[in-house]
């Protein structure tokens, strides 16, 4: 994979969603980290590959990635690989080419099933297909084109489980029950508890505290 192709893999969604105000662009570094063996521990027990699809005029019309995580695959009833980072123009033909490409690669490596859209490694980002509620997504939640559902279902993908995400306006009046406020007041009076605002100069310490929690 050349530097130019890696860059195009990241840049294509930015063009695809440029007129969609609800789309939140992932950090380039986060996407690259998924495919970097030095930053993704999943490579110690698996492998990943990614492709871009171009049209007759040479412009990118889609992208996809495929993964094999041996630990996750062994936990399934049959050898199962993963498909993710799927993005495509509104073209069923292009979508099926991407699906076929991932399927063939996985099949050649002994996989009998394909799960997607998923991520290679941690399952807190880039997991799932949004099928309802096309509003601005919460952190780490999937967002995609509405027509993706038709392509996945037409290809033969079936719903494995459903996941819901919700938004809550923390600035709204009575957003928390009164008992929560009483509990917070009670805890705040106990010795050993302090409240501090985030300080950029001590970002490492605050990050370490968050990780420990």
Predicted features and spans:
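Flexible loop/turn segments at secondary-structure boundaries
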Residues: 60, 70-73, 122-124, 173-174, ...
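Acyl-donor binding region in acyl/amide transferases
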Residues: 73-161
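Short amphipathic alpha-helix that is part of the acyltransferase structural core
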Residues: 1-38, 190-213
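Conserved beta-strand in the GNAT
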Residues: 50-52, 59-69
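Structured loops at beta-to-helix junctions and adjacent beta-edge loops in soluble globular domains
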Residues: 54-56, 69, 86, 119, ...
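Acyltransferase donor/substrate-recognition loop-hinge adjacent to the catalytic core
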Residues: 142-213
